[in-house]
Amino acid sequence: MSEKIYFEPTWELPNPFYKADGSIMSTKAEWEEKRKAYLELLSEMYYGKMPGRPQTLTASELSNETICQNTVCHKVVRLCAQGEEAPVFFNVHVYRPVMPCEEKLIPVVIPAANTLPGEIISMAAEQGFEICSFEIAEAAPDDKEKIWEGGCAKAYPGYTWRALAMWAWLQSRVIDWLETQKDIDVTKTVVTGHSRMGKAALCCGIYDERAAVVAPAGSGCGGMASMRLSGCRLGENIGLSERIGVMLNKERFPYWLMENVADYGTPDGKNRFRENEIPFDANILGACVAPRRLILVEGLDDDWINPFGTQVSWLAASEVFEFLGVKEHSAIHYREGGHAYTKQDWSVVLDFTKVQLCGKEKTTGYKSMRENENKAGYSWRCPKTNN
C-alpha cells in the first residue's frame, strides 16, 4: 500500500482527510495530493494499471440514418486506437439531434448500450444532448475467458488492468474522438452507465478529468455501494446485498477487478470477512471525482445493489465536495423500483447536468448534502479549510 495513505482498519467508512503522517488536512492542495495517492492505490489494488492515451486514434463512418420520426441522426463510427502491440477496434453509436440547437450539443458518453430505448434517445435530443454509446464485444468482451483475447488485452499485454478499467479506457477514447468533432461542447461531457457499466463509468470519471459529470446508475458493489456497510432501503436485511468476494468469485466475475481485493470479502477460516482492512471504500471512489460533478441515480428496491451502502457512501463522499466548497456538485436521486436505468433516471441525470453546467433551473427532485445532515456509517466530518 502507498506510504502516502494513512489508514487504520475500521468498519467505518475510511476518513479521506488523513495526511500521510496521521494528521488532518486543512487545505485544498493537500486533498489534491491525497487524491493522486488514492489513484495510485486504486491502480495497484483495485482497477489494475491501465494505459494512457493511444499513439493515434482514427475514425471511419460505417452507417448513417435518421430515427425517432426523423428527429435524430444515428450513425455508427468505427474507432481504431493504436496500442503498443496491436490496434484496438470498436464501434461507437452516435445519436445526434437533427434540428440545430441554440448552443453546442452536450455529449453524453455511455458504454455498451447501443440498443437504447427510443424514448431515451428522443428525450436527450429534445434537450440538446448528443448520446454516444459504444460496443465492448470486440475490444473487451464481458467474459472471464474471452476478455483476454480482446483488443485491449492484446494491445497492452504488459498492463494489469481488469475489465472495468478496460471499459473505462474505451469510454475515454470516445471522449478523444469527441474532441475532434464540431458543434460539440466537450467541456460538458457526461460519462454514465448502469450496473456493471455504471462501475466502469465511475472508473472513467475518476481517472479522466475531462468528464465534467460522472453519473453511475445502480452501480452497486465495485461502484458506489460500500464494501463495508450493506442493507436495503432502510438499512434492513444486512448481508442480502452483493459483497466483493461474491462478485469476484471465480465462477462469476473474477475479471472485473484485481483478484486480491476479493480475498477481503471471502471467509478465510480465521476471519469471516475482512473488508474493514481495505484502505478505501466506495466513498473514496466518489470523492476522487471532486471537485467535478457526481450524480447517482438508484432504485429503492434494488436490494442486491445495496441501497443503504450506496447512500452512506455518497454522504461520506460529499464531505470532500463540501471541503472543496462545492457540495452542490454531489447529488443523489432514489426512485421506487428495482434494477434498471429508467426514463426517470435519465431525466434526473440530464437535469442535473443542465443545472450544473448550463445554469438552468432545477426541475427534478435529486438532493445534495444538507446542513446538519444525519450521518451514518462514519463519525468523522469535513474539516475546516485554510483556503
Residue ranges and their predicted role:
Residues F134, T192-H194, P216-A217, V297-G299, ...:
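Generic beta-strand/beta-sheet core signal
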Residues K104-T180, G220-S230:
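Cap/lid segment of the alpha/beta-hydrolase catalytic domain
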Residues E103-V108, Q127-E130, V186-K188, E209-V213, ...:
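Loop/turn elements at helix/coil->beta-strand transitions in domains of secreted/extracellular proteins
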Residues L116-G118, A139-D142, G198-A200, C221-S226, ...:
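Flexible loop/turn segments at secondary-structure boundaries
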Residues P216-L285, N306-W314, E322-V326:
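Mobile cap/lid helix-loop segments that gate and shape the active-site cleft of serine hydrolases
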Residues M1-N91, R96-C101, E209, M258, ...:
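Alpha/beta-hydrolase-fold serine-hydrolase catalytic core, especially in secreted/extracellular enzymes
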